[in-house]
Amino acid sequence: MTELGAVDALAASIPATPWFTRVGQPLSDSDRANVTAYVAALDLPAGPVEPVGTWKEASRVAADPDWDRRWWQAEAREQRRLQAWAEERHGTEATLTALTHVTEAALDPTRAAAEAASDEALSKVAAGAAAQACHLAALALAAGKPSHGFVIKHRIFAAGRWPLGRVGERWYLF
């Protein structure tokens, strides 16, 4: 399968993905391993992976003033790097067309799944995070990096979870 073919396959898989179906459930060894692999792939500090039990607790973690911004910064750096690689491989127009297709495919399914949050603002944040994970995974695939950390992050979301980030020394997974 070509790189852009892999992006198309990702887009086609989005409607059947069980978005947010395992939030609040106990973490499995696989959940912890995926978070650990994702963190390592972005060259971020390791730490214990803590479960988040409720949408209310997820809101608190996401809004915590001690939330570690290095995660966001590492993702932004990687996104710029992968964008350049993908455009070099496929051209700007083909890359943007493929990424737009994935983003559009993600909007409705992620939004509908995130409605489980009783807080409308949190629901929008959750849906946006899931759609962004799709976009980033597509970018990694388009750049020819099928085992990139962004693909791992998408795997976490596709397993029904939401990685909320790092607060203090801990990584939180809903």
Which ranges hold each PLM region?
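Short, glycine-biased loop/turn motifs at secondary-structure junctions and
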Residues: 1-174
